[in-house]
Amino acid sequence: CFGIQPLIMMTWARKNKPEMTQQLADATTKVGNEADAMVIPVGLAFAEAIKQDPKLELYRADKTHPSPEGTYLEACVVFASMYHRSPVGLKYYGIEQVEEKTAHFLQEVAWNTVCEYFDWKK
């Protein structure tokens, strides 16, 4: 209706429950397909970033909410999904600091995750 497509954000697993990732991915994808909505695969990007760099801290102390790095990764995945463009090279203007090297890594993870999820060519 009116050329609008709903978006559903796939959330991330809690830090101490990484096994939730696939359950969240499957459930969100199913709902997205049923609702003809675009699913934004943030949870898969979190899992991939942690897989590639287990020391990266994407969570706040509560092990649920995102750290500045987690929030930045989320923003990169949303950008890539909505605009079909790579976030690699975008400037970071957040209030809380994310190191440039880390920001670049998160941009790469976001783009690769989105391309894989939607089966896009890079």
Summary of predicted features, one role per range:
Residues 1-7, 37:
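A short helix->loop->beta-strand "cap" motif at the edges of active sites that frequently abuts
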Residues 10-17:
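Surface-exposed cleft-lining segments at the edges of enzyme active sites
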Residues 17-111:
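Catalytic His-Asp segment of secreted/periplasmic serine-dependent ester chemistry enzymes
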Residues 111-122:
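Long, charge-rich low-complexity segments
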